[in-house]
Amino acid sequence: MALAKRNDIRNVAIIAHVDHGKTTLVDELLKQSGVFRANQEVAERVMDSNDIERERGITILAKNTAVTYGDVKINIIDTPGHADFGGEVERVLKMVDGVILVVDAFEGAMPQTRFVLTKALALDLPVICCVNKVDRPEARPHEVVDEVLELLLELDASEEQLDCPFIFASAKAGYASLDPDVKGTDMKPLFETILSHVPAPEGDSEAPLQVLISTIDYNEYVGRIGIGKVTSGTIRVNGEVMLVNHHDESKKQRVKVTKLYEFDGLNKVEVESATIGAIVAISGIADIHIGDTLCDVNNPEAIPFQKISEPTLAMNFIVNDSPFAGTEGKFVTSRHLRERLYRELNTDVSLRVEDTNTTEAFKVSGRGELHLSVLIENMRREGFEFAVSKPEVLYKEDEKGGTLEPVEQAIIDVPDEFSGAVISKLSERKGELRNMTTNASGTTRLEFIIPSRGLIGYRGEFLTDTKGNGVINTIFEGYVPYKGEISYRGQGSLIAYETGVSVTYGLFNAQERGTLFISPGEKVYSGMIIGQNGKAEDVEVNVCKTKHLSNTRSSGSDDALKLSPPRVLSLEQAIDFIETDELLEITPKTLRIRKKILDPLARKRASRKN
């Protein structure tokens, strides 16, 4: 077997904690390599193509692009920084020969930095560390270098990985430098470091073909598109190849490659053939899935598929049966819901979907609340109407039959005066304080290990307790023996007593009991939750009640009644809020929280039984 290097290619992934600037860095590499015309209007974070990615400023799906520097084509993959989308990170790292780790010059190494770095080190990939945002006034690049080296040591990096080059950059200002004290002029130091530090792909172009499919794209004209790296051999348009299923290698089928693409800038460019080291997109194969291998017809040997981290959290997705069901959504039936959820499995390897004992509900398991909430938001925008239950963690059993539960590392930055309240709340939720440091600017960093179920519903409380000044980052740590019962929400719900339209007078009386979620003029139904009670129990309130009229007293003006602005819940806040006997109703226009049992008498009977 004659192994050869493709010195004209480098394959590199950019990995980072959420919001440390990697997508902006890719934008700058695209601009400075001449992908865009000089006068072309370019959107910020051009790699984040999905609406939710642009709105939230996070990357959810791994993206492929390529730039040419000198005579070398650099294939760049921008990966998600959040552990909930770790399935994406783990897969795409199989396509590359090195990684650029982007770390914020102020925040330093964070929980997700550890997560993505662990995955890269496990595959023995060389690392280039890019300390980004060095132009921030509070930047501390020298300390951040030490933090990254400590993290590499902690994660048992090899000697080669420990000897990683450091680049100091401001992606926003468009420069990089090899010295933290010297401001650069362009991105040349980073380009040069990629060429010198990331090895050229190696393989035998005459050997039997092997292409591992790492991502699936979809185009309504050509259907499913498989994306992967040519590990050995050569793939050709109109050539016959063997598709080997990663679940069952005995499942093999002969297929034809109708179109073949390589990446150039943000575009896919049609090519006739591709050989070792090339990252290609292949269309014309209807049954292609993530993890499958395209092989030589006469020598169909599959590449082992990277085992993806298991889900830790589950929710039920349920057909909406509220009194307002079907009035705002386009896709509302059980068939619609089932088809959409199972379709998601084609592109999301971290997701699990199971049928339940009723055709109206499906159990959906994912890597965390963000993972599932992004799916919910996508479905909502597509016109789906459905309900979801409170998230629940997925337990495991040890060898002796004991219960194991998932725990997370939480790193929290709060102003000093709020640290006591945070420690108290997390301790109640079975959190263990592992480390506490205070810096000169009056901020305390707390490091906790806490059960995943202890974090469900906590983020809303955290924002209240820290007056919106706290930052919490979490990362899955592993499974430990069950830590015992946790007492949850200390406040009950305000429940609408009757179906109708809310009025100022009814809301004015209800707001004395707690915090409202709705304004006057909103349609409500009996059993719908319209606010949070100040006390622990649930209370029924009549928000449709108008002022009683009499001969001696006119109704007066409702304008004289002053209502506090309602608390409008985001999707994540609403998911955090619901209890086990409640559901979140989701339509393209509205989020409504409701009791599972809408009838008040039936609800009382059920609570007595429990």
Predicted regions and their residues:
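Structural and coupling elements of P-loop NTPases
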Residues: 1-610
